Amino acid sequence: MKECVIKSEGFYICFQLKVFESDVSYSSNTILTISVISDNFSANTDMDIDIKSFVVFVDALSSLYTTLNGTAIIQEPYGEQQYIELSADRSGHINIRGKLSSNGRGGFLQKLSFENCIDQTYLPEFIGNLSSFCSRYR
């Protein structure tokens, strides 16, 4: 999958998905690689997720953009339960928050909790790219 990116002043997030087709019937069948830079704090990590849960996330994100209401969350079902959550307010601001972690060099656990805000106009291309990728898993 190509990179799906949101880049604004002070915030960057990138998703890349690798689906293990032979494991689609299992609850963890996809690696979601996430890169985040939020006001000069950054993380790059992988989440083990279910592609079907990711489709639900993309649908919720599309609805959030259309209605400026609700939330969209993708969360690891096991382990550190890393997550990315987007929510909207009626004025068109999209709040993004998350908790990411990774075992760094030497096995030291690294964690990043972040919050940021972007304008809704950053979402259409991001949602379009994610929806295009997810179409075969509907």
Walk through the language-model features, giving the residues of each.
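Charged, alpha-helix-forming regions
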Residues: 1-26, 30-38, 43-47, 135-138
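A structural detector for beta-sheet-dominated domains
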Residues: 7-9, 16-20, 35-37, 50, ...
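Short, well-structured hydrophobic secondary-structure segments
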Residues: 33-69
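Short beta-strand segments
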Residues: 43-47, 82, 110-114
